[in-house]
């Protein structure tokens, strides 16, 4: 709502912006018309140099990164933006109906409402190198998120050569999902989409790491960001690449 926009010296913050890097399918819904826009996220840069051990065995069919909000296991902010309610529904279908084995990171001590409890493992918080190892040891990653600008675990999973199973309604990160990386699902197509994904994995259809490294990272995304900035201000110093500072 225009009246609710933050004002600085009587003008909308947007009026001071020369260009937007965004994550949206339809940026015009969120960004003022007439401002240059580029589909670019921090996750375009954060995964290309991660250590990948291609010799690790596959121990799990899927991994889900779903940190609990508290020891009472109630849904708070993290559970909301990670979409734990849909994650649990997916896990139930994946393990109870399809017989898949999963590892749920971050929910140690919290119940998961499924019958085949022997088909899931839960962990507490794990250090980043261990998380990457678990991703590599999984056949795919479950990402049910919607309110997510561009989930880091998605591109980290791609860099670990692990395909992705992603909520079609995710706000950002959707651009990484294609016939080289994985599939989308909706709440009504979980079983069907997961079956397609597993069949494709069995037939070696996917090459997620190759896709990510060839289409994102410093050389590709850095060149695109440089060109975008130069289009806004041609007087910027010459350089080969520009990148975001990644956390």
List the predicted regions and their residue ranges.
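A charged, aromatic-enriched C-terminal amphipathic alpha-helix characteristic of glycosyltransferases
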Residues: 188, 201-247
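Aromatic "clamp/platform" in nucleotide-sugar-dependent glycosyltransferases that forms part
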Residues: 145-146
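Catalytic core of nucleotide-activated saccharide and alditol-phosphate transferases
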Residues: 1-76
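A short alpha->beta transition loop at the rim of the catalytic pocket in nucleotide-sugar-dependent
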Residues: 139, 161
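Short alpha-helical donor nucleotide-sugar binding micro-motif in glycosyltransferases
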Residues: 132-138
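Short hydrophobic beta-strand element within catalytic cores of glycosyltransferases
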Residues: 163-167
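Conserved catalytic-core segment of nucleotide-activated headgroup transferases in glycan assembly
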Residues: 45-122
